[in-house]
Amino acid sequence: METFDAIQLPYPGVVGASLLVILGIILLFPLDTGHFISINQHPWDFFQTKAKQEFEYNAAALLNEGLQTGRSAFRLVTNMVTYLILKDQYAEEIKNDSRFGAHEAVDPVLLVDLPGLETMFQGSLHNQVPPMAVRALNKELVHLTPFLSEEAMNCLQTRWTDSAEWHDVSIPETVLALIAQMTTRALLGPALCRNPEWLDIAKSFTTNRAIAVAAVQSWPSFLQPVIHWFLSPCRALRRQIQCARNILLPVLERERRSYRSDQPTKREFSNLAFIDQYAKGARYDATMAQLRIIAVAFQTTSDLVEKVIARLCKHPELIQPLREEVVSVVGKNGLHSHSLRKLTLMESVMKETQRLEPAVIIGMFRLAKEKVTLKDGTVIPKGTNIAFANDLRFDPEMYPEPETFDGYRFQRMREDPEKIDLTPFTKTRMSHLAFGHGKHACPGRFLACDEAKLILCHILLKYEIRAVEGSPPELRARGMFVQLDPGAMMSVRRRRENEFALHG
């Protein structure tokens, strides 16, 4: 396979001269760092190569070093951009402040203006549509529960079989297959949720996009608008998007004929149809709209479910109490959206896992669109990228023995009137920023919660699970991301007991 280093640019002398000009600009006109200390900025590291490498392999240690200074804000060079890291105490003040832009902070990092990585609406619509579409989906979750449960059952039976013998399975592959099938059912209906070609695209798009972004970001920013045309990961991503179009557009045409028909018929919710009607004739790319939503939805939910399953492998003492809760709650009330809300121990295990092992160690990214003076006098210069330190999740006053995993932690907190408001999994707080906070909080967290609980219900009632002997599933940290090892395995077998059938 072609490597990035093997690509030769024409006129290397021109490139070299351009780099010298940039170096001169840096030396003559250094960036305004304000009065904030920098944790990993080094003299003569003009292109921040050393700083970025340090962050890539020691991000958590660098973040902790900044917190140990006792300052409420400090600068940290990451492998993406330099962030002003703020302690979580500022999250409540900033969460809805329009002087800080969320999309303005994320879009340049994700290179959304490059073909294959782009947004899908002209003008400002491209950032308005995904949250609107997901919020519309949230209203349908109560009706979708039995359908999502059916897809979870189908996927698990296909991948894990009904074998009563212990056999090893991949945790990441299982979870990704489940999320792909269930989320496609939620977004696009029954037409595509078992389509192998579409599911392959849905499962791999997020990873392929991340690889393409990393490939482009390895080049200087002034070359990125051109170099992406020649990079193999970008070309492969554009081919995959075209394959997705070939699958989605015929489905969209059928949706259009249905909702434009003079015959009023009751139709299932379709994200394709919702976005098409929301556009009201505006030019947009229906395929990129769906892929953008999928890229976010899959990452959040897959990361959560993988880590919860890994925790259960490490804490098998939780499996039977969780199973008994499912039997008690779902056996009495049936498998409905409202009964999922009553699985408080399961929700506690999920939230405790997310508290200790969020997908990213910093969060709630914003860009200061103007100079901002906070209430305590802290001045944030215009153009500053900010992120929050996620430090309150280790506050011992809020979470006794915060470094220790306690699956019952949030269930016990429900008994404390002063802390009960912190317990719902989908509730955002400055002490728990895994889903963000404020008006830009992740709108897909409700779907993620329901999908995670449904998956766990099916696993707990139908299978025995355990860690592979001598090889417990472990996490792998890289930069700001903390993910389950892609090679993580577990052992499973079909249970003999069958308390009741999971159905709506």
Swiss-Prot record:
GO BP term, pick one: secondary metabolic process
Transmembrane segments: 9-29
Keywords: Alkaloid metabolism, Heme, Iron, Membrane, Metal-binding, Monooxygenase, Oxidoreductase, Transmembrane, Transmembrane helix, Virulence
Native source organism of the sequence: Neosartorya fischeri (strain ATCC 1020 / DSM 3700 / CBS 544.65 / FGSC A1164 / JCM 1740 / NRRL 181 / WB 181) (Aspergillus fischerianus)
Membrane topology: Single-pass membrane protein
EC class name: oxidoreductase
Family to which this protein belongs: Belongs to the cytochrome P450 family.
Protein's cellular compartments: Membrane
Gene it is expressed from: ftmP450-3
Signal sequence, start to end: none
Role noted for this protein: Cytochrome P450 monooxygenase; part of the gene cluster that mediates the biosynthesis of fumitremorgins, indole alkaloids that carry not only intriguing chemical structures, but also interesting biological and pharmacological activities. The biosynthesis of fumitremorgin-type alkaloids begins by condensation of the two amino acids L-tryptophan and L-proline to brevianamide F, catalyzed by the non-ribosomal peptide synthetase ftmPS/ftmA.
Molecular function as annotated in GO: heme binding; iron ion binding; monooxygenase activity; oxidoreductase activity, acting on paired donors, with incorporation or reduction of molecular oxygen
EC code: 1.14.14.119
Binding site for heme: C442
GO cellular component: membrane
Major subcellular site: membrane
Protein name, as recorded: Fumitremorgin C monooxygenase
Catalytic activity, as annotated: fumitremorgin C + 2 reduced [NADPH--hemoprotein reductase] + 2 O2 = 12alpha,13alpha-dihydroxyfumitremorgin C + 2 oxidized [NADPH--hemoprotein reductase] + 2 H2O + 2 H(+)
InterPro entries, per the entry: Cyt_P450, Cyt_P450_CS, Cyt_P450_E_grp-IV, Cyt_P450_sf
Pathway: Mycotoxin biosynthesis
Cofactor list: heme
